[in-house]
Regions:
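Metallocofactor- and cofactor-centric catalytic cores in central/energy metabolism, strongly enriched
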Residues: 1-216
Length: 216
């Protein structure tokens, strides 16, 4: 959880954060601070941590939180946009409300954009791991080395085990809306979902909350 929250806090589109903590939960402030520091070692992102159980009252906590938020907004509004190379751009791709045309039109267009970005030195992240069930061979053939391919296979097997443990399966993936709009099988949905990743080589496989470290 702390790694997930730290990812949100250190996202390039986030100027800063005010974190409200109860004080006795498992995800302690110290743990979140450590996770944020690992993703932002230079401390470029202002983060304010407030603990309810250390505050004199709930009203005082809310007042303090609002103060830090509005102070942060004033500071963020002074920031001006600066030019940046496309090699610094990282885009994560996600399906919208998928229908029978997603794999024919929308997703291939998204994949084409990702291929162009990668060719220019940027990075694309193909999300929704479970939706790739049934098209693993397509991704495996694009992995740059055996270690990357094995990690992909290992994570797919792990997702399958998690699904089995709760009495679910990847075949249950298509929603009623998907089926109504033409995606009648999980294989069709998976084939379309993979199109978002284009045809570029797979250089890295990430587990949940992990951060990309390589361009591509």
């Amino acid at each position: 959880l702390c790694n997930l929250l730290a990812g949100y806090i250190t996202h390039p589109n986030v100027a800063g954060a005010t974190v409200l903590s109860l004080g006795c939960q498992k995800a302690q402030i110290a743990m979140l601070k450590q996770a944020v520091a690992s993703k932002d070692p230079q401390g470029l992102r202002p983060v304010h941590y407030l603990e309810q159980q250390a505050s004199t009252s709930e009203d005082a906590l809310i007042e303090q939180a609002l103060g830090t938020i509005f102070d942060g907004l004033r500071e963020a509004n002074q920031v001006t946009r600066q030019p940046a190379p496309l090699s610094a751009l990282r885009i994560g791709v996600e399906c919208g409300g998928s229908d029978g045309f997603s794999g024919l039109s929308a997703n291939p267009v998204v994949g084409g954009v990702i291929d162009r970005l990668v060719a220019l030195g940027g990075s694309g992240i193909l999300s929704e791991f479970p939706e790739l069930c049934g098209v693993e061979h397509e991704l495996l053939s694009r992995c740059v080395d055996d270690a990357t391919a094995e990690r992909f296979s290992s994570l797919m097997r792990a997702y399958q085990r998690h699904a089995d443990a709760v009495g679910a399966s990847f075949s249950m993936n298509p929603s009623p809306g998907n089926i109504r709009d033409g995606l009648i099988t999980d294989a069709m949905k998976s084939a379309g979902a993979a199109k978002k990743g284009g045809d570029s080589p797979v250089v890295e496989v990430l587990d949940y909350t992990e951060t990309a470290t390589r361009p591509g």
